């Protein structure tokens, strides 16, 4: 059976042609395919616009803040980390990573989303453990 497929493949490579015979290709680009920029922007020419034509919107009404304030933790997160700081310090003494905390919390019977939230809080705790001393 393998010999039959092998002979069929060899005969196809010898006799067959991979190029289509009904397509004529020309190295010269047709002048009808070249369009000006203005014509290309018309919706009739292109069903989808690829270039942005909108004017730049005014950015005066954007809400701006300092970059340092963007990275500050939410007060709720800080309170939650301080509440869990004794547990987090025990994990830190065992040199546990966030996935270890997630695994241990999940195995102790908490739901997945609670374990994920606690492991995310532990990740933030690891950045500066001294800042989150307990109450």
Curated annotation (Swiss-Prot):
It is found in: Secreted; Host cytoplasm; Host nucleus, Host nucleoplasm. It comes from Phytophthora infestans (strain T30-4) (Potato late blight agent). Residues 126-135 are annotated as: NRL1-binding domain. This is RxLR effector protein PITG_02860. It comes from the Eukaryota. Keywords: Host cytoplasm, Host nucleus, Secreted, Signal, Virulence. Interacts with host ubiquitin E3 ligase NRL1. Effector that promotes P.infestans virulence and suppresses pattern-triggered immunity (PTI). Interacts with the host ubiquitin E3 ligase NRL1 and enhances the association between NRL1 and SWAP70 to promote proteasome-mediated degradation of SWAP70, which results in the suppression of immunity. Its main location: secreted. A motif (RxLR-dEER) lies at residues 48-64. Belongs to the RxLR effector family. GO terms for cellular component: extracellular region; host cell cytoplasm; host cell nucleoplasm. GO terms for biological process: symbiont-mediated perturbation of host small GTPase-mediated signal transduction. The keyword Secreted applies. Residues 1-18 form the signal peptide. The RxLR-dEER motif acts to carry the protein into the host cell cytoplasm through binding to cell surface phosphatidylinositol-3-phosphate.
């Amino acid at each position: 059976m393998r010999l039959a497929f092998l002979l069929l493949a060899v005969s196809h490579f010898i006799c067959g042609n991979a190029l289509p015979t009904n397509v004529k290709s020309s190295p010269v680009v047709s002048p009808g395919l070249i369009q000006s920029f203005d014509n290309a922007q018309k919706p009739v020419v292109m069903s989808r616009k690829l270039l942005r034509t909108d004017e730049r919107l005014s950015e005066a009404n954007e809400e701006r803040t300092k970059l340092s304030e963007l990275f500050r933790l939410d007060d709720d997160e800080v309170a939650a980390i301080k509440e869990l700081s004794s547990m987090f310090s025990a994990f830190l003494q065992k040199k546990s990573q966030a996935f270890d905390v997630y695994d241990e919390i999940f195995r102790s019977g908490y739901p997945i989303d609670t374990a994920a939230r606690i492991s995310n809080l532990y990740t933030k705790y690891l950045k500066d453990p001294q800042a989150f001393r307990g109450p």
